[in-house]
Regions:
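Walker B catalytic acidic pair
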Residues: 98-99
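Helix N-cap motif at beta-to-alpha junctions
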Residues: 235-239, 278-280
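PLP-dependent enzyme catalytic core of the Aspartate aminotransferase-like
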Residues: 125, 248, 262-306
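Conserved glycine-rich beta-strand-loop-beta hairpin in the small C-terminal domain of fold type I
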Residues: 192-206, 218-233, 247
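Conserved core of the PLP fold type I
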Residues: 1-91, 102-124, 239, 296-298, ...
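Conserved core segment of the aminotransferase class I/II
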Residues: 118-199
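Hydrophobic "anchor" residues on beta-strands that sit immediately upstream
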Residues: 60, 94, 130
Length: 306
């Protein structure tokens, strides 16, 4: 296959809502992005199969399979198996399996993610997937270590390219991480400390949402068992207005459409909430302001319709 840069037309499938930095990479390189709606089981696999198996310009799909950013979905076993059994029209199609939140549990009763590579090996499709993760939200963002998993063929290809980019890796940083975490048990123990900080914050926001918006019919939201985000869908056509009202009241949110390619939410309804940084007291105040703005925006829309 020719390098993607020498091919005229490239497409990537983008589960939505999804991760803005994934979409930003495609945008920088001029790769056309195609929205694939998320379901409670993961991406709409019937749509994924239709695109991948029939269009040889579809070269990849972005996936955050555990606690997806931003809706917190963990892909079901059936979804993972359907990924492994894709029959791409393009020989150079790849699944970009970004398992960024693989140990970021907020609950003891957390979902299990089937191993995609194991499923691919069963059907001989292991060249189709590139799996990766990092300690960005475990140790230090931008100063952690990263890992990649793929077939020998893909690894040989990647090593040849990386060898031209760097002479060596930051061995001292790798050593720091090994000495600090030591092993899998060390990582898990450390993540319990993260959970102790994060879960009360998630609970505070979700509790306020229930208190202020239950039964109002103006918003639905996720209650994730892990990850870093709460995804809120307000009334269609209201997300940008909610964010504008919040800003006027002193609460800054991520921009409308951030979880969609080209920052264009076709229904203008999704808002990503990241409750990790503020104190619980600040979160409770901000969540109340947010719910009030949801009510105001919904009221404006309903009045305008009449």
């Amino acid at each position: 296959e020719k390098p993607w840069g020498q091919q005229k037309k490239l497409k990537f499938l983008c589960p939505v809502p999804g991760y803005d930095r994934h979409f930003g990479i495609c945008e920088v390189f001029g790769i056309q992005m195609i929205n694939v709606p998320m379901t409670p089981e993961g991406p709409d696999m019937t749509l994924v199969e239709s695109w991948v198996n029939n269009d040889d310009t579809v070269k990849g799909i972005w996936c955050v399979p555990q606690y997806a950013n931003p809706d917190g979905t963990t892909y079901s076993d059936e979804t993972v198996r359907r990924f492994a059994n894709l029959k791409p029209a393009a020989g150079d199609f790849r699944i970009f399996w970004d398992n960024a939140y693989c140990v970021h549990h907020l609950d003891d009763d957390h979902p299990h993610l089937l191993n995609l590579m194991d499923e691919c090996k069963k059907v001989g499709s292991e060249d189709m997937v590139v799996m990766f993760c990092s300690t960005s939200k475990i140790s230090f963002s931008g100063a952690g270590v990263a890992a990649i998993g793929c077939s020998k063929r893909n690894m040989d290809h990647l090593k040849a390219k990386v060898a031209m980019q760097t002479i060596s890796f930051d061995k001292l940083n790798q050593l720091r991480h090994v000495r600090f975490f030591k092993n899998k048990a060390g990582v898990e123990a450390h993540m319990l400390k993260h959970r102790a900080l994060l879960k009360p914050r998630f609970d505070a926001v979700i509790r306020t949402f229930h208190e202020e918006m239950d039964g109002a019919g103006i918003a639905v939201w996720t209650e994730p068992k892990g990850g870093y985000f709460i995804s809120v869908d307000v009334m269609d056509g209201c997300a940008a207005r909610v964010i504008e009202l919040c800003k006027e009241a002193g609460v800054t949110l991520t921009g409308a459409g951030c979880a969609y390619p080209y920052h264009k939410d076709p229904r203008d309804r999704n808002i990503r909430i990241a409750p990790s940084y503020p104190s619980i007291e600040e979160l409770e105040k901000a969540a109340k302001i947010f719910t009030l703005c949801c009510k105001l925006a919904a009221t404006e829309k309903l009045l305008a319709a009449n």
